[in-house]
A protein has these predicted regions:
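Conserved HAMP-HisKA connector
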Residues: 1-10
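Conserved DHp (HisKA) dimerization/phosphotransfer helix of two-component histidine kinases, i.e.
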Residues: 17-93
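Conserved catalytic submotifs in the C-terminal HATPase_c
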Residues: 95-105
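Acidic ATP/Mg2+-coordinating residue in the GHKL
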Residues: 155
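Short conserved segment of the HATPase_c
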Residues: 160-172
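Short alpha-helical Gxxx[C/S/T] motif in the catalytic ATP-binding
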Residues: 185-189
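Detector for a conserved hydrophobic position within an alpha-helical segment of the HATPase_c
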Residues: 193-194
Length: 223
């Protein structure tokens, strides 16, 4: 499914799940001798659910609002530092190979571009884990292609069919459980890349993993 129906369905399911948790807490507390460990477990689930709803709502807001980027000469080393700092906070034990020409310079808004790469790295690592390949690294590398600097994020996940590749950049599309993923990540990434006068492409085959390529115009300093 695609479109706003997924968004509405996801919120509804989460709120219904929260209602069930609230009912369980209330029923347990009404007992003469409530099991506080069960209450704490339900409270923890409720907190996690609410945090997820807040996080996804913020993600949707960031994607929906107009992007106002400030492009300045930025090295890949600077982008790498910001991106990996955020990624390591979420997945400190993830296996990652990083091969960037750190002195290469592009015109970029460092915060937004790092956010896009963070999304791609997060997707890549989760694809590895979902495929049972948590013992294999994901890769972030750079190269040159004519007038562009190319950033590649590569995973060893299950890969995608051609049909899936045609849908992944649509807003609200997701191959994951719609209750936990609202399918804004890649749409958000492409929005950021386009704001950098760049492009985003994907190469993938079922069972062979996936590569995402971010193409950004090379920065050439005026002489």
């Amino acid at each position: 499914r695609t479109g706003a129906s997924v968004f509405v369905h996801s919120i509804k399911n989460q709120l219904l799940a929260n209602r069930i948790l609230e009912k369980r807490i209330s029923q347990e507390l009404d007992k003469p001798e409530p099991d506080l460990s069960r209450v704490r477990a339900c409270v923890k689930q409720l907190q996690e659910s609410n945090e997820m709803l807040i996080s996804r709502s913020e993600e949707l807001y960031r994607t929906a609002k107009n992007k106002s980027v400030t492009l300045v000469p930025t090295t890949l080393g600077q982008i790498r530092e910001t991106t990996l700092e955020r990624f390591r906070r979420k997945y400190p034990d993830a296996l990652l190979e990083c091969r960037l020409n750190e002195s290469e310079t592009v015109l970029a808004d460092g915060n937004y571009l790092s956010e896009a790469l963070y999304n791609l790295l997060t997707n890549a690592w989760e694809a590895n884990v979902d495929a049972g390949h948590g013992d294999r690294p994901i890769r972030l590398s750079s190269s040159r292609e004519r007038l562009y600097v190319v950033l590649e994020v590569r995973d060893e996940g299950c890969g995608m069919t051609k049909a899936e590749q045609k849908k992944i950049f649509e807003p609200f599309y997701s191959s994951k459980n719609s209750n936990t993923s609202w399918g804004m990540g890649l749409y958000h990434v492409r929005t950021i890349v386009r704001a950098h006068v760049g492009s985003l492409r994907v190469e993938s085959k079922p069972g062979r993993g996936t590569s995402f390529f971010v193409l950004l115009p090379k920065y050439v300093q005026d002489r």
